[in-house]
Amino acid sequence: MFARMSDLHVLLLMALVGKTACGFSLMSLLESLDPDWTPDQYDYSYEDYNQEENTSSTLTHAENPDWYYTEDQADPCQPNPCEHGGDCLVHGSTFTCSCLAPFSGNKCQKVQNTCKDNPCGRGQCLITQSPPYYRCVCKHPYTGPSCSQVVPVCRPNPCQNGATCSRHKRRSKFTCACPDQFKGKFCEIGSDDCYVGDGYSYRGKMNRTVNQHACLYWNSHLLLQENYNMFMEDAETHGIGEHNFCRNPDADEKPWCFIKVTNDKVKWEYCDVSACSAQDVAYPEESPTEPSTKLPGFDSCGKTEIAERKIKRIYGGFKSTAGKHPWQASLQSSLPLTISMPQGHFCGGALIHPCWVLTAAHCTDIKTRHLKVVLGDQDLKKEEFHEQSFRVEKIFKYSHYNERDEIPHNDIALLKLKPVDGHCALESKYVKTVCLPDGSFPSGSECHISGWGVTETGKGSRQLLDAKVKLIANTLCNSRQLYDHMIDDSMICAGNLQKPGQDTCQGDSGGPLTCEKDGTYYVYGIVSWGLECGKRPGVYTQVTKFLNWIKATIKSESGF
């Protein structure tokens, strides 16, 4: 739960792609600007609300490097880069986003604080998407547009389900005496309001914590800087909206919510909601099956149970939702690799089969006895219930892998996992395989990178991050302004042309570059190397060039 309360006064986290080829690290640059900066801090941008503010923003020529104009560009508004329903307007090779209130920023990714003047008195101020872009939720018995009027606390009776209301000496205080089977401040919570498992799917109406504190609404202005609020990516998927009901979007132990402490400070607490009893849960009948001595592959590949919304906040450097990249693997060493890189996570990978992980060859200069692969990991410093850990039985490095002038060529390897209790990875919401590509994706396709942002100094984020990048044609990537014929046919380039430096260097060496088609994700590249992080695109191993080798290696070792 560390990320819920992180200090959020940071530029976007940039991570160095590859090994030692990169000219400098933006991690180091950020640290030089702010000595107190740590890579576990995230930025959820917001601005003070100004009704007259021009919410349109144009990316100008000065913000783009010279190489941006070396080739005819596709329509910069396809796909629409404007978030939260913003309209994209083309201006030559650039674009302008016309933002709907209360959003602003060059891509409408920022949420304006429409509650800064505290217009709600004895109530909560909530940010909305319709004029005046806020509304007041009054604390009973206060009422009125600004929660300044008072009504009798027990007339009419605010208590529900036949409960009786008792007035206290203070006119604003009251107690509801709940009948059996009901609880809550207004006796509104029935006995059937319970959660199953860890409560990830809980959609009940409990809004108080175990310490009987009232939950904040998810669209409260106090939560603008938190990782979890109504304006986060996939909010609807996690049951988060304009309410203050408990939820468990990060798959913690049980549902939780934010509460106000003092001076507009917030913290989180677990909620006063119970786990469902066995009789409350209907389990489907299982038909008998024949015993199997061999674990089959997963039912499907490239499918995530975390749906993507069409309206999103910015990706670069933000904490990823648990289960969004279920094929992401963390390669971890039991020994320090260098003086500056301690033991633990050092590279990424992609699960392509229950017993096989795809990674970069330059990540495999380590003995198998010192190597561990962790699947389903979200927080590197926290042992999570959905993690699956395996030792590595064997490393298969591509035979023609080599490094020339510190640039890796044919940078691809396979890790064969050592089974635990007779099986390798088990499919879950947090652990799934990604598909191997069956064709090419065109230049300009928007793809995803993910990882913990490890640099050559060993520094990075404890939380899994993700970013979006676009595929770039090798002809452009080999131009003099970029890599000047350093890119061969085993490599592909990807970056963010509209805003270089924001997403290009995210991810870990060996981590996946995934592209989506018809709701299925394919591992199209492997994070390999790059020069001048943030100024030039990242370079990835092109997986399609090695499909025959991948399939032949797995077949020869697995017998199928």
Curated annotation (Swiss-Prot):
- EGF-like domain residues are 73-109, 111-148, 150-188
Instruction: Specify the glycosylation sites in chain numbering.
Output: N54, N207
Catalytic residues (positions): H362, D411, S509
According to its UniProt record, which protein family does this protein belong to? Belongs to the peptidase S1 family.
Broad class of the protein's primary localization = secreted
Q: In which tissues is it expressed?
A: Ubiquitously expressed.
Quote the PANTHER family the UniProt record gives.
Answer: HYALURONAN-BINDING PROTEIN 2, TRYPSIN-RELATED
Which protein are we looking at? Answer: Factor VII-activating protease
- Which enzyme type, at the first EC level? hydrolase
Q: Which organism is it from?
A: Homo sapiens
Q: Name one GO biological process term.
A: cell adhesion
